[in-house]
A protein has these predicted regions:
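Acidic, metal-coordinating catalytic cores used for nucleic-acid/nucleotide bond scission
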Residues: 79-91
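Acidic/His-rich, divalent-metal-binding segments that scaffold phosphate/diphosphate chemistry
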Residues: 153-235
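Conserved substrate/cofactor phosphate-moiety recognition/catalytic segment
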Residues: 22-74
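Phosphate-binding P-loop
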Residues: 1-6, 69
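Short hydrophobic/aromatic beta-strand immediately N-terminal to the Walker A/P-loop
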Residues: 9-11
C-alpha cells in the first residue's frame, strides 16, 4: 500500500468466501487500519450475520461510520462484497468532500475455490448466492473514482497456465445454439482478435490489450449457457445472461503478454455488452451516461472491442 498524508479508504471487492476478510485483517494488522465489515454490523444490529432483510438501513449506517472515521483522520477498510459498479460509484461520490485516498483490493479467488471455501466454513451461504454474485461481478476501474486498484490472488490461482489463445482454440467446436451466433464460440473470438490484427484501423496505445480482451470476451458463456429465457420459460435457443460478468471475473486468471493489464482486460469484458444495448434501443441517454462516467479514452477502447465483436459474427 502507498503511503499518504491523508486518510486512506480501502474498499474490498470479491465474492463471498473469496478471502476478503483475511486480506483485510492482515492489512489492518500491518498498517493500523480500522475495519468496517458489513457482516459484523449485521450481527451487531440484527443479531444475525445472514440477515439480508435490512440491507438498505445497514449500508446507510455502515457508510455513516466509515465517513465519520475518515473525517477523524483514520485509515479505513470497507469489508463487503462491493460487486456493483453503480453502488461503488455512488459511495465514492459520498466521499467527495472528504480529502482521502481511495484504494480498491480485488480478492481474486476462482469461483470453484470460493465454493470449496464456503463449504468448509462454520457459517456459510447457499451456493446459489455465490453463483448469483459471480454472474453480477462488475470489474472495479479507475473511472469509478479510485486512486489505486490492486488484485490479491488466492494462492496458486494465477500460475501462468491459462493463455487467451489456448482458451479460444479449446472452444473452436463449441456450438452457441443461438441463431444470432452462427459461428462457434472459439471461432467467433479468434475472428474478433484477427479482425483487429488485420485491419489496424486504430491509433490506440491499448490495442494489444483490446486484442487480448477480444480473444476471451465471451469466455463466460459456457458457465452461463441456459435454455431458459428471462421469464424462466424453456426455449429452443441458448441464452447467456450475465456472461460478461462471469467473463470479466474469469479473465483475471488468464496469463497475458508483457505490458498487458489483466485489470484493463477485465474492465473491457465487464462492459462489452453495453454498446449492444444502447445501439439496440437507440438509447442516446445511456451512451452519454457511460461516456461521462468512463471518459473519452475508455469509451474509445470499449467501442473498438465492440466493432471487432460485431465484425466477427
Amino acid at each position: 500500500m502507498e503511503t499518504s498524508t491523508n486518510p486512506v479508504l480501502v474498499m474490498m471487492v470479491g465474492l463471498s468466501a473469496s478471502g476478503k476478510s483475511t486480506i483485510a485483517n492482515n492489512l489492518a494488522k500491518e498498517n493500523n487500519y480500522i475495519i468496517f465489515s458489513s457482516d459484523e454490523l449485521r450481527e451487531e444490529l440484527y443479531g444475525d450475520v445472514n440477515d439480508q432483510t435490512h440491507n438498505h438501513e445497514l449500508f446507510i449506517e455502515l457508510h455513516k461510520r466509515i465517513k465519520t472515521a475518515l473525517k477523524e483522520g483514520n485509515n479505513v477498510i470497507y469489508d463487503a462484497c462491493n460487486l456493483s459498479s453503480k453502488r461503488r460509484v455512488a459511495f465514492l461520490q459520498e466521499l467527495k468532500h472528504i480529502n482521502c485516498r481511495k484504494e480498491c483490493i480485488i480478492a481474486a479467488t476462482p469461483y470453484e475455490q470460493c465454493l470449496r471455501n464456503n463449504a468448509s466454513r462454520d457459517r456459510h451461504v447457499p451456493d446459489y448466492v455465490i453463483e448469483r454474485m459471480y454472474k453480477s461481478f462488475d470489474t472495479p476501474y479507475f473511472y469509478e473514482g479510485f486512486d489505486h486498484i490492486s488484485i490479491e490472488y488466492w494462492k496458486g490461482s494465477c500460475n501462468g497456465s491459462l493463455l487467451p489463445m489456448s482458451w479460444a482454440i479449446d472452444y473452436k467446436n463449441y456450438n452457441q445454439d443461438n441463431p444470432h451466433h452462427e459461428l462457434t464460440l472459439g471461432v467467433h473470438c479468434i475472428n474478433a482478435f484477427f479482425w483487429l490484427y488485420n485491419n489496424k484501423l486504430y491509433d490506440n496505445a491499448s490495442i494489444g490489450t483490446i486484442m487480448h480482451a477480444a480473444l476471451i470476451h465471451d469466455c463466460g458463456k459456457p458457465f452461463c449457457k441456459t435454455f431458459k429465457n428471462n421469464k424462466v420459460e424453456t426455449t429452443d435457443i441458448a441464452h447467456y445472461y450475465g456472461h460478461e460478468h462471469v467473463g470479466a471475473y474469469d479473465s483475471l486468471f488468464f496469463t497475458y503478454g508483457f505490458g498487458i493489464s489483466s485489470l484493463f482486460v477485465s474492465a473491457l469484458i465487464s462492459n462489452h455488452m453495453k454498446p449492444w444495448v444502447w445501439e439496440r434501443d437507440n438509447n442516446e441517454k445511456m451512451y452519454n451516461k457511460y461516456k461521462k462516467l468512463w471518459g473519452d479514452y475508455f469509451m474509445e477502447c470499449v467501442m473498438i472491442l465492440h466493432v471487432a465483436d460485431k465484425a466477427a459474427h
